From Swiss-Prot:
Family: Belongs to the frog skin active peptide (FSAP) family. Esculentin subfamily.
Signal peptide limits: 1-22
Name of protein: Esculentin-1Vb
UniProt main location, coarse: secreted
Organism for this UniProt entry: Odorrana versabilis (Chinese bamboo leaf odorous frog)
InterPro entries cross-referenced by the UniProt entry: Antimicrobial_frog_2 (IPR012521), Frog_antimicrobial_propeptide (IPR004275)
Keyword Secreted: yes
Disulfide bonds: C78-C84
Entry's localization field: Secreted
Role summary: Antimicrobial peptide.
Keywords, in A-Z order: Amphibian defense peptide, Antibiotic, Antimicrobial, Cleavage on pair of basic residues, Disulfide bond, Secreted, Signal
Taxonomic lineage from the root: Eukaryota, Metazoa, Chordata, Craniata, Vertebrata
Length: 84
């Protein structure tokens, strides 16, 4: 019985050591991935901010342009009808 305990104990100890080494490597990989993700997200957030600003400018430009067109149409229709 004692002869079976030594190899079993050795296997358990080697398993624990390998698991702890794997866990350390996994933690290091997770740290690297989180830093990479932070870098990616800041780039994405900057792009979204730029896109948001451009969309706002574009919307304001469209509304201003439509107001000018409406005013021009009103002026032309007024002159055509002779009501001005």
């Amino acid at each position: 019985m004692f002869t079976l305990k030594k190899p079993l104990l050795l296997i358990v100890l080697l398993g624990i050591i390998s698991l702890s080494l794997c866990e350390q490597e996994r933690n290091a990989d997770e740290d690297e991935e989180s830093e990479t993700k932070r870098g990616i997200f800041t780039k994405i957030n900057k792009k979204k901010a730029k896109t948001g600003v451009f969309n706002i400018i574009k919307t304001i430009g469209k509304e201003a342009g439509m107001d000018v067109i409406r005013a021009g149409i009103d002026t032309i229709s007024c002159k055509i009808k002779g009501e001005c």
